[in-house]
UniProtKB/Swiss-Prot annotation:
This is Uncharacterized protein C2orf66. It comes from the Eukaryota. It is found in: Secreted. Its main location: secreted. Residues 1-38 form the signal peptide. GO terms for cellular component: extracellular region. The gene is C2orf66. It comes from Homo sapiens (Human). Keywords: Secreted, Signal.
Length: 117
């Protein structure tokens, strides 16, 4: 009985195939776990707009607590995010909006006239 040695894989071929399979399975498992965990985190985190004063106040209080928990007290620094404690009445804000709108129309018309030559 003659055994053809060309059909028998060598030790290095078997070893490299055996180490690739578990490594490939590990990579696939990590990718799938990352997608599952990433999807749950994305569903839980919903950002609220900071133009609402309550949301803005909550955001900055949580940010300050985060830094304080890591040993950095932001109370010793000047306030880089000033909040408007006494907002103007609505009539002043509408005047500013009307003024800004008039300025925009003026610039738009002057640019249009410039293009006409």
């Amino acid at each position: 009985m003659i055994i053809d040695s060309s059909r028998i894989p060598s030790f290095t071929q078997l070893h490299s195939t055996m180490t690739r399979a578990p490594l490939l399975l590990l990579c696939v498992a990590l990718v799938l776990l990352g997608h599952v965990n990433g999807a749950t985190v994305r569903n839980e985190d919903k950002w609220k707009p900071l133009n609402n004063p309550r949301n803005r106040d909550l955001f900055f209080r949580r940010l300050q607590a985060y830094f304080k928990g890591r040993g950095l007290d932001l109370g010793t620094f000047p306030n880089p995010f000033p909040t408007n404690e006494n907002p103007r009445p609505l009539s002043f804000q509408s005047e500013l909006t009307a003024s800004a709108s008039a300025d925009y129309e003026e610039q738009k018309n002057s640019f249009h006239n410039y293009l006409k030559g």
